Amino acid sequence: MRNLDAMGYNAVSTDPLYKHIPFTITQRSDISYGLFYDNLSSCWLDLGNEIDNYHTAYRRWQAEAGDIDYYLFTGKQVLDVTKAFVRLTGKTLFGPKWSLGYSGSTMHYTDAPDAQNQLMNFIRLCEQHAIPCDSFQLSSGYTSINGKRYVFNWNYDKVPQPKVMSQSFHDAGLKLAANIKPCLLQDHPRYGEVAERGLFIRDSQTDAPERSSFWDDEGSHLDFTNPQTVAWWQEGVTTQLLEMGIDSTWNDNNEYEVWDGEAAATALAAKSPSNIFAR
């Protein structure tokens, strides 16, 4: 159970998923129970699939680091168990009503050289074909420079008037959600500034920003255990998105696929920073 960007996941032949929560539920005829393993490191769960001549089917949990800390929830029904679980962890917030409607999305529009025209044409096509639509997911092409993605960077050649474009969507009754990524490529226009301020996860050997493979290059992931990083991120969302008329964010590629198991963060109490930040 390690958070990986598992694009193309196959339920039959592959293990990794995008996100993992080490919580299992068992249902019996007269009782249901759940086990939540409170450990942020990479872990393994064997739910009775191994065969041992000397033992009946058993379950096994193994963690790369940390304590054996778990919670047991019981109830007559699975619903009782899940209610107890979310009382401990907190619930998912209800999204706005518009988030339940049809939402358009494609990388084609924002990757096109005339992205703004393509996006405006989407509005016209919805009207032409009487397609009800409540929102559009703005893929990361709007941030690109030479094909690579740079969070909080508008490509004004593709989208020369972000505010005008946003207003056109609003006039048509559509909300906009913009793609953002919590990792800066090594040649991001603001990489040096962010590195100098110590806002990245740090390499365990050099104390320099840790670099991992990310979107056709190498990049450094932001350390959100640092309050200054949170403030920098909030400033970027506000000035580059909300003030441009964007209604919501699409937090993408946030698996934190960091393979340096000893990488350091401001408030890191366990191994596997990838799991800590992704969860």
Task: List each model region and its residues.
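Catalytic and substrate-binding clefts that recognize carbohydrates or anionic sugar/phosphate headgroups
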Residues: 1-99, 105-108, 115-117, 123-128
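Conserved aromatic-histidine-acidic binding/catalytic patches
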Residues: 7-15, 73, 110-114, 154-157, ...
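Short coil/turn segments at secondary-structure boundaries
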Residues: 96-103, 138-139, 253
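Active-site mouth loops of central-metabolism enzymes
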Residues: 102-117, 219-232
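Aromatic- and carboxylate-enriched substrate-binding clefts and catalytic-loop regions
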Residues: 132-279
